[in-house]
Amino acid sequence: MSQVAYLPVGKREQTKVQNRQAILDAAREVFGELGYEACTVRDIIRRTGLAAGTFYNYYRSKDEVYVALSDEGARRFTPLLKAQRAQSADWSSFVRAAIEAYFGFLADEHKSWLARRPVDEPIPHVHGETPEMTAVFNEVRQAIVDEIARGGAPGADPDYLAAACIAIAREVGEKMVARRPIDTKAAADFVVALIEGGVKGLPKSPV
């Protein structure tokens, strides 16, 4: 079961957190068993044991539930990314450590519910920016800015480079979990080589 990142005060707030977590846990199971496209909100509600009205107090659609699950994943990954940045001596070591941590995280998530789905089933993309996604982006961007400041990375545009690194890792990660067996090392080697090689050819830009 996933972890809740905060502790509420008061019985009412405790109930809200428990209901929200029950919906997310049920959705994770239903998405894994039936597939995102095939399942309905009713399938999720039945699994929670909550009333339909209670569900709609928190989410309006299965799309919103999927976004919430994505947010939860990003929230849990952000501390891992911070730890990698703190432990890395330079830009290259950070890229390697961050990509390996991300792909390991994806592989673990895959075991929880994606592994029960057909390998060729499309995974829905989350559109729009959430606070958790922004936190991941900002952590990558700050790592790039820090490395530029101490001369460990070329003076590339940090916003563009952070966005490119995240996009590459996300897209390759989707392909990685669709393969059998899942090879996190091969995927990480490919992405690191692509990022490092691409950075070398970038024009320098002041921060």
Residue ranges and their predicted role:
Residues T15-A27, I44, V65, L69-F77, ...:
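Generic hydrophobic, amphipathic alpha-helix propensity
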Residues A22, V30-E64, A68:
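Helix-turn-helix
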Residues A68, K82-H110, L161, C165, ...:
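Hydrophobic alpha-helical connector segments
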Residues M1-Q18, G155, P203-V207:
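N-terminal intrinsically disordered/low-complexity leader segments
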Residues M1, A101-F105, G155-K175, A186-G198:
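Hydrophobic alpha-helical segments that form the core
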